[in-house]
Amino acid sequence: MSSLLQGVNLYLIGMMGVGKTTVGPLLAKHLGYGFLDLDGVIAKATDKSINQLFAEEGEAGFRQIESDVLSQVCAFTKLTIATGGGIVLRRENWGYLHHGLIVWLDVPVELIYRRLAEDTTRPLLQDADLKGKLRSLLEQRTPLYSQADLHITVQEGETPEDIANRIIEVIPNVLKPQASH
């Protein structure tokens, strides 16, 4: 697998609550890669929580910071990177993401809702109609998420280990070994 990937980063994309930050370290371990949570890097770099950044900078300001951090992170190799759910919204981010292998973790809204119903740390979810907000965000982002190299549909009851193993199994389908002449 390592020879097939040749150090190329893996970027996990998808809605908040799909398990990118949980699956990412497992995937990294399988590959002998490092793991980065982009939101964690942003929080550390700015010394502010994501909620604080949204409150102080607005979504547009946060998205700019996110792009700046992504541009720096993509210079490294052998990383599995969990991105924020909105990383796909800015065209410039796709230029960075395409330096690696993009994996979309696709989880049904019902399951995301159950995972996030009690979560007060997500700035885009401070909405009375949480399920409606999730549906709306997913509808808006699905055409963008679908540009990923790999589309992993997560089923109810699948463990993070199951998901990581499925990703490992399908990576060879999108990466062809370099032909030796």
Curated annotation (Swiss-Prot):
It catalyses: shikimate + ATP = 3-phosphoshikimate + ADP + H(+). Keywords: Amino-acid biosynthesis, Aromatic amino acid biosynthesis, ATP-binding, Cytoplasm, Kinase, Magnesium, Metal-binding, Nucleotide-binding, Transferase. HAMAP family: Shikimate_kinase. Its cofactor is Mg(2+). Substrate binds at residues 39, 63, 85, 141. Catalyzes the specific phosphorylation of the 3-hydroxyl group of shikimic acid using ATP as a cosubstrate. One of its GO terms (biological process) is chorismate biosynthetic process. Pathway: Metabolic intermediate biosynthesis; chorismate biosynthesis; chorismate from D-erythrose 4-phosphate and phosphoenolpyruvate: step 5/7. Mg(2+) binds at residue 21. Gene3D superfamilies: P-loop containing nucleotide triphosphate hydrolases (3.40.50.300). This is Shikimate kinase. It comes from Nostoc punctiforme (strain ATCC 29133 / PCC 73102). It holds the Pfam family SKI. It is an enzyme of class 2 (transferase).
